[in-house]
């Protein structure tokens, strides 16, 4: 023991004593001291062997071992306290209890994948180091193929099959995890019933799956981690495929987007080919994003993993990565319209920035920030009345283009830069954006009126005054402001005026004399 100096006792068990200690290099550790007598020696050797094969953030790490004639010393990472002390010192709400349970389940999933049954999971054998849960004390643990279903563990945490002397497997750890979760929620001993438990239906459902008396029906660690209760902790990634590439260093590693992937440190997200809305493509190009639902795969150290199984430490990195993607979508313009010096930036997120001669208006999370040239800022619940018509028209134009156009460029944002309504042209889009448009669609500019997007016998009109409507010739109908109106209905006066304005254009199509 020349390398370590023992300090105070921090834990005692039936066959061992745990001390805090410090190495010659100043590293703080925990030292488990086990006398060489009875079964204790074999158990500690077994524990050292198991912990040496387990490398996981939710399992206490082994640093080394030493021996003397009378004792075996197992050196482990030092933690702050166990869950018994934690419960005595802090109030635990549902969110905190769920976070603790999730880390316990991550640890159990890992050891179960190695064929190890813990067999003595309880509050005293679950440690906290900072905000991270660590399962410890593998003295009663065994490999599943060597399991003889002996009676062992701590009475209050024993699964029914252990108490009844039946054969058992990994499910005993799941039952114990359920008991730990129950105690975290109630600070009471589990009494075989959930009738008096006051909690959300979601948590009750999770507990019922963990405390299922029939081991064959009891949730395993993977199934429990997939429970909807934990979805609140898993960050979702927004569609990054059209964003420009980026690369920068952070304290968590290199943050990078290249092609259909984003990554940070050991975490990578790959976009994958998903289903298309309506079941079909707008054209035959397999690289097109139009109508394709955004789905993705998550990788840790180049191995694909279900996001529900990602550890708490990895979730922090994943959260930073998805937050950066979201921020990039909010500040990267997809379409820019220059309207007589007033610029409208339509972002990948669906938000916008309107930069006028006297003010700037930003849409942020359903609210608006208006900044005047004087430096005065105002926060609003809605677009100001004096900008409502202009902003509404510009936003409608961008949404219509975003919906109808097939975007191919995924290495840089797709931008449209037009100096006025009259110069707002699809040739401008294709030149600036380097995109292609599906062959069966044609775009026509109607002098002093607006744009028409022709899709077969359907016509989408983007008017210069901001109005948008679709004429469905086969149905003799008009889609206007979310309603389907038939030509012989009583149409709104403004729509009637718009239809009257486009009638010469429609007649010219019928006569075959219109040149696009």
Curated annotation (Swiss-Prot):
Ligand binding (ATP): 10-18, 32
Xref: InterPro entries: Kinase-like_dom_sf, Prot_kinase_dom, Protein_kinase_ATP_BS, Ser/Thr_kinase_AS
Sample GO molecular function, one term: protein serine/threonine kinase activity
Enzyme class: transferase
Superkingdom, taxonomy of origin: Eukaryota
Record Gene3D superfamilies: Transferase(Phosphotransferase) domain 1
Entry EC number(s): 2.7.11.1
Gene Ontology CC annotations of this record: nucleus
Recorded family membership: Belongs to the protein kinase superfamily. CAMK Ser/Thr protein kinase family.
Name assigned to this protein: Probable serine/threonine-protein kinase ECU02_0550
Lineage: Eukaryota, Fungi, Fungi incertae sedis, Microsporidia, Unikaryonidae
């Amino acid at each position: 023991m020349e390398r370590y100096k023992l300090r105070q006792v921090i834990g005692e068990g039936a066959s061992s004593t745990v001390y805090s200690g410090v190495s010659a290099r100043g590293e703080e550790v925990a030292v488990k001291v086990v006398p060489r007598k009875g079964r204790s020696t074999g158990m500690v050797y077994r524990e050292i062997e198991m912990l040496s094969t387990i490398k996981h953030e939710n399992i206490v790490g082994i640093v080394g071992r030493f021996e003397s004639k009378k004792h075996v010393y197992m050196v482990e990472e030092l933690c702050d306290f166990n869950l018994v002390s934690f419960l005595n010192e802090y109030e635990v709400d549902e969110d905190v209890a769920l976070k603790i349970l999730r880390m316990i389940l991550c640890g159990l999933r890992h050891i179960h994948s190695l064929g190890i049954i813990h067999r003595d999971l309880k509050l005293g054998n679950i440690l906290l180091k900072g905000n991270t849960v660590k399962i410890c004390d593998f003295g009663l643990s065994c490999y599943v193929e060597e399991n003889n279903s002996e009676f062992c563990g701590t009475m209050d945490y024993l699964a029914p099959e252990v108490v009844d002397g039946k054969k058992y497997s990994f499910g005993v750890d799941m039952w114990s995890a359920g008991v730990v979760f129950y105690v975290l929620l109630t600070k009471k001993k589990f009494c075989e019933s959930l009738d008096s438990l006051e909690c959300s239906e979601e948590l009750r459902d999770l507990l019922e799956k963990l405390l299922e008396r029939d081991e064959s029906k009891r949730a395993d660690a993977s199934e429990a981690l997939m429970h909807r209760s934990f979805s609140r902790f898993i960050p979702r990634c927004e569609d990054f495929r059209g964003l420009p590439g980026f690369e920068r260093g952070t304290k968590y590693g290199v943050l990078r987007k290249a092609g259909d992937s984003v990554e940070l440190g050991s975490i990578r997200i790959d976009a994958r080919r998903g289903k298309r809305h309506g079941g079909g493509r707008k054209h035959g190009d397999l690289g097109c994003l139009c109508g394709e639902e955004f789905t993705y795969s998550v990788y840790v150290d180049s191995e694909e993993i279900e996001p529900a199984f990602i550890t708490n430490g990895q979730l922090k990195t994943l959260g930073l990565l998805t937050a950066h993607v979201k921020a990039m979508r909010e500040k990267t313009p997809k379409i820019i319209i220059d309207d007589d010096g007033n610029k409208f930036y339509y972002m990948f997120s669906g938000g916008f920035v309107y930069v006028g001669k006297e003010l700037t208006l930003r849409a942020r999370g359903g609210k608006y920030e208006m900044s005047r040239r004087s430096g005065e800022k105002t926060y609003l619940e809605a677009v100001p009345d004096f900008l409502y018509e202009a902003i509404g028209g510009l936003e409608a134009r961008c949404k219509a283009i975003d919906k109808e156009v097939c975007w191919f460029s995924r290495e840089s944002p797709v931008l449209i830069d037009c100096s006025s309504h009259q110069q707002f042209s699809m040739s401008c889009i294709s030149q600036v954006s380097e995109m292609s448009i599906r062959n069966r669609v044609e775009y026509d500019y109607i002098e002093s009126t607006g744009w028409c997007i022709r899709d077969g016998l359907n016509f989408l009109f983007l008017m210069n005054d901001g109005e948008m409507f679709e004429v469905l010739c086969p149905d003799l109908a008009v889609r206007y402001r979310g309603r389907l109106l038939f030509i012989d209905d009583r149409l709104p006066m403004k729509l009637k005026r718009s239809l009257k304005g486009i009638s010469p254009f429609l007649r010219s199509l019928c006569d075959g004399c219109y040149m696009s």
